[in-house]
């Protein structure tokens, strides 16, 4: 309840401080920096450190008094060590230097940075004639003077000006305050830093930053105060400071409103401080002095808070992919002060200053609802079609494809290409299909490379019309011959001209009309005189080929030339396929023709103009006059004195260049055409460069693979490459032989054709007879049926074989009911591809399974390592716990010995008592009762032997856990016992302290009677009386301090007695409850024992049950021991409470007697108590 009320009181202050920090700079409250830090204070000279020393001071007008300084012991009454200047040292304590030592310094060396606000010094003796205060903010490396102080600045510091400083480097001298008797009775010096720099134009925050930060402070006494001499013995010259206050706080750069203890700081009374060391930082700052931005708040540079501007550190923007960042000044300057944080250790495959882009070979995940861990996914480029080593687009994921490859993953060949392989630098190779007979959008299948023919076009390359069709050159497929069935010799027409073979007396393309006596197609002239062959390329002609009269070739649209073998202007591609160019070419060509016409007209007009007797064109004359005026203007500009020679030369050079350009202007169409071809040349060069780059990367990868592999693998690779090269060479040689054979066959066929055409009557009957024989034999229908797998009924001979041979569209697969060699071969090929794909999938699945097995092995190894590490930690923790118990018992014994030592004073007893009572015990008897209930619950679950046998393992584990918890409760009970023993020791020590107080009072009474008898002697002999009075004063001060401490201790012990009585009553009630619980446990245990006795032959299970029983008996014994100890503790508390009440009654009477003695002594020794 008490912490709740403290929180309620502190909460408004905390909220107010946070609001103050939210409005701008904020600073912690000030306190005395010296309290609790006297160990950091040192003096260059201290009296009585090695041996006692005597110093004399002026007393009254003509007298002097001399006192002793003995600083060998820190708490001696005559000790004047430097730690006495702290405000916590109490009255009648001061620091004093040795006599006649000059200069002397007091220096404070702190271990952290603090903010100093004010320095206050009170002097015990004469004020110094000259001194200076300086500070260091880098732990003593460099020093800067705050201010010079002197009784006479002109003589003490002649080179230092007086007044207020006007800049940070301006240091002035301030006169010391002059008061009556200041040289004899001391004085006070106060230095406020804000008042010191009040004349400097700067904000409050800037002043604190500039002069408030300290790590070291030094006060240098440079000149002793002049003391006038009285009689033959001069007074002693020394420096003495009774109190030094350093008001300040922890130094937080305006980013904190309170301070906290540093980690691991001791909380003892001797080290209690008013000002803690570490700042509780605000504004997203961190560090002991808030000197840097907190982690992940580095988006702007750190700056001290100033006035209303907190200069709050801003959080870095890493898009959720990092928790660490750093500040980069270059980035901050490039963003013009907008941001400067650079993220570190980007996760999820991201990179960049803000983890805003994907890493190389990763791209942005565009799937809706993707988690932040799936922001970037790996590129899915096909290694066969993508450029090796080239990353995909980080936004779209588009891979960089080879020249003849397309698709987002580079897994498809472009139209007209097939055979995607990794070894091909261009990815795919061009289909070997006839451009006239194949489809325009997709000439071939991209996987198999099979040509896709137009309607009625056949052949592996789509280069032949189907039987009874012609006109392959149309590009739309072949058309039926449509020969007249009565007038033609055969339904098959010429594939190129469509001319049907007509019967005698009939003519025309389809033999549909009677023959006209004129030269046949592709000839011209007169039939009577003889027909001559047309000199034309019939692939580019139409109709009869040429004019029957003149022989001029009749070109198809888009073709030109004497033989119709050239593409007409406006048509592109190569002959015989001439297609209309892009519409932009027509526009460009029209513009060129218009410009050519205009140029011709201009040339004709100019020639007629200069050939006449004079210039008749008035417009031309006006233009010439205009040119002359411009030339005059140019001359005027050139003659202007404001123009330099360099500018004139530049203008002249420009005019000369323009004149040359005008003179060289002419219509240069070839240059324009060359310019238009430059983009194509650049594209060709780019493709060549990409091919070379791909080849280089492939060779490099092969080299790296070979260099990283073993020599046997490299040898196998070389052998494979050699075999592939040999096979390729063999194929080339076979192709060469096949081409030679085809060439010979073609020549032989041409020779036979010529012979047949020019043989006259001898050859014709033989050819007719051969044709008649081949029209019936051999019959190829069974062969084609076996080959194609169909049931053809029509006869097929070498002369006539109508219809399609294989109606399955160029030999495609026909499914599971295939018959014939060709369909089954196609089906087998497809099945082989499917099996290969299944094998690749099976291989990938094997790889994934292998990875899963490896991951499982690694997980098992990690679990085993974790178990071993946990076992080691448990063993170490047990050893550490046993060592802590041993050290705790040793400490309790040491404290007990220290408190029972008769030489220990009451103040030390009080400090130890406070420290012991301040300890917080984490447990009480309620914990013991809880463990009893758990043991009882276990006993309740044990009566059924069959259930015990089935759950032996779980019960053993649960028993071991409860055993550990019981051991922990036992340790806590020992701690409670130690606390009670400490309380008893405190009571005994209180008794000893009371006895010492009675002895001291008796000694004081004897000293008082001695003083009353020797008053006359004291007036005659001064020095012995002074020594005696000094001794009595010291004893009186010690006695009064001890009595105050004993009074406080008595009150506290009374309250503790009441609390102990309440605790004893509660412990008694819990003990009774625990006793009842143990009675129930005894009953359950007896029943369990009976059942276990009945099942003595249970083998291994019985042994386990016996082990559980033994552990339960041990727990029961330990619990009974704890109950006995609790009873003993209750008795000790009762006896201690009674002893405290008796001692309190005795202290009441002694307090009155002490007050009477104090008043009497103060009245008698008032004259002698003058040594301050």
UniProtKB/Swiss-Prot annotation:
CDD domains: cc_LAMB3_C (cd22303), EGF_Lam (cd00055). Changing residue 199 to A: In JEB1A; somatic second-site mutation. One of its GO terms (cellular component) is collagen-containing extracellular matrix. SUPFAM superfamilies: EGF/Laminin. One of its GO terms (biological process) is epidermis development. Residues 817-1170 are annotated as: Domain I. The alpha-helical domains I and II are thought to interact with other laminin chains to form a coiled coil structure. Domain VI is globular. Binding to cells via a high affinity receptor, laminin is thought to mediate the attachment, migration and organization of cells into tissues during embryonic development by interacting with other extracellular matrix components. Laminin is a complex glycoprotein, consisting of three different polypeptide chains (alpha, beta, gamma), which are bound to each other by disulfide bonds into a cross-shaped molecule comprising one long and three short arms with globules at each end. Beta-3 is a subunit of laminin-5 (laminin-332 or epiligrin/kalinin/nicein). Interacts with ECM1. This is Laminin subunit beta-3. It comes from Homo sapiens (Human). The gene is LAMB3.
